[in-house]
From Swiss-Prot:
Coiled coil: none annotated. The gene is lpxK. This is Tetraacyldisaccharide 4'-kinase. Transfers the gamma-phosphate of ATP to the 4'-position of a tetraacyldisaccharide 1-phosphate intermediate (termed DS-1-P) to form tetraacyldisaccharide 1,4'-bis-phosphate (lipid IVA). ATP binds at T54, V55, G56, G57, A58, G59, K60, T61. Belongs to the LpxK family. Keywords: ATP-binding, Kinase, Lipid A biosynthesis, Lipid biosynthesis, Lipid metabolism, Nucleotide-binding, Transferase. Pathway: Glycolipid biosynthesis; lipid IV(A) biosynthesis; lipid IV(A) from (3R)-3-hydroxytetradecanoyl-[acyl-carrier-protein] and UDP-N-acetyl-alpha-D-glucosamine: step 6/6. It is an enzyme of class 2 (transferase). Pfam families: LpxK.
Length: 341
């Protein structure tokens, strides 16, 4: 399964956004009301929601990983609740990174499961309760902000600094999952990732609403294997340009790029095409950790292709060194107040 946001969503509003405005009004009315009026069920564990305002990539996965690591460093045992985009499980499933494939559980849960227990289920309460039975004492909800299926003690909304919220319109006229004003009412803090001024509008809105604003960067974690080499970089993620920039930040020369749809399921012809293109120009092949997870668990992918494929992973670093710990403390404090209130 793959999804791809129309390119016009990320530009200034044009005739297409205008033509879709009536449908967007209806969608926004329904999604906004559901978000504002919902009273999500609660679990007896602290819950941090890592979400975003729009469809498409903003940096939720590295953010969730950063908080899982931070919780572990503080002596907690975090568990992650996910819907498992792109997978085909309809019930409750504990992700096993040693046996599960991306086609069954999704690429993001496989990455997250390297750092903490991940439970997949459309019923997020059931998933959280199952993680509690395994000994988890802190829940990270990967996405799920708009669905309101599990109460979050703290909702951190992630936005990309360069893309922001695109044209600011609601689906299908733009990338917003619900009207920004409605989403902001339920937001506890904003996390702006990267450099750029594309998120200036949403930052101003968050400031006016009195929401804390944090800043962070995605740092390449494997620069040594990338620097000084010429690459054909390819990615099937929500914001591939962010990945290409990360390769450059790591010291690599990006000669060619090839972008696929988000969560793209690669076919043998895709692999042959990438290999041929790289061979003709004398380039190395490099991709994201998410894409590598999908490729590595796909049947029929040549082992020699995987062995030569470079993977650039990234870590999230807050600009303020105390930010991550402060958010974790706030989640726990709010949970305790809820429990004893």
């Amino acid at each position: 399964m793959a999804s791809e946001a129309p390119p016009f969503w990320w530009d200034e509003p044009d005739w297409r956004a205008l033509a879709l405005a009536p449908a967007a009004w209806i969608y926004g009315r329904v999604s906004g009301r559901r978000l504002i009026r919902a009273v999500p069920p609660r679990v007896s564990l602290p819950v941090l929601c890592v979400g975003n305002f729009t469809v498409g990539g903003a940096g939720k996965t590295p953010t969730a990983i950063a908080f899982a690591r931070g919780a572990i460093a503080r002596g907690m045992k975090p568990g992650i609740v996910s819907r498992g985009y792109g997978g085909n499980y309809s019930g409750l499933h504990l992700v096993d990174p040693g046996h599960d494939g991306a086609r069954h559980v999704g690429d993001e849960p496989l990455l997250l499961a390297r750092h903490a227990a991940v439970a997949l289920s459309p019923d997020r309460v059931k998933a959280a309760e199952y993680l509690k039975s395994l000994g988890c004492d802190f829940i990270i909800m990967d996405d799920g902000f708009q669905s309101a299926r599990l109460h979050a003690d703290f909702s951190l909304l992630v936005v990309d600094a360069s893309r922001g919220i695109g044209n600011g319109r609601v689906i299908p006229a733009g990338p917003l999952r619900a009207p920004l004003t409605d989403q902001m009412r339920k937001t506890d803090a904003l996390l702006c990732i990267g450099k750029g001024n594309g998120a200036d509008f949403v930052i101003r809105q968050a400031a006016r609403a009195g929401r804390p604003i944090y800043h962070a960067q995605l740092r390449p974690s494997s620069s040594a294997t990338v620097a000084g080499r010429r690459w054909l970089a390819f990615a099937g993620i929500g914001n591939p340009d962010k990945f290409y920039e990360s390769v450059r930040q790591a010291g690599g020369e990006v000669v060619e790029t090839h972008s696929f749809a988000d969560h793209y399921s690669f076919e043998p012809d895709d692999i042959r095409g990438l290999v041929d293109m790289a061979r003709r120009q004398g380039l190395g092949l490099i991709t994201t950790a998410k894409d590598h997870v999908r490729l590595a668990t796909m049947p029929g992918v040549p082992p020699e292709f995987l062995s030569k494929l470079a993977v650039l992973d990234v870590d999230l670093e807050f600009d303020r060194t105390d930010a991550l710990g402060h958010i974790l403390d706030t989640v726990v404090e709010r949970f305790k107040s809820r429990l004893h209130g």
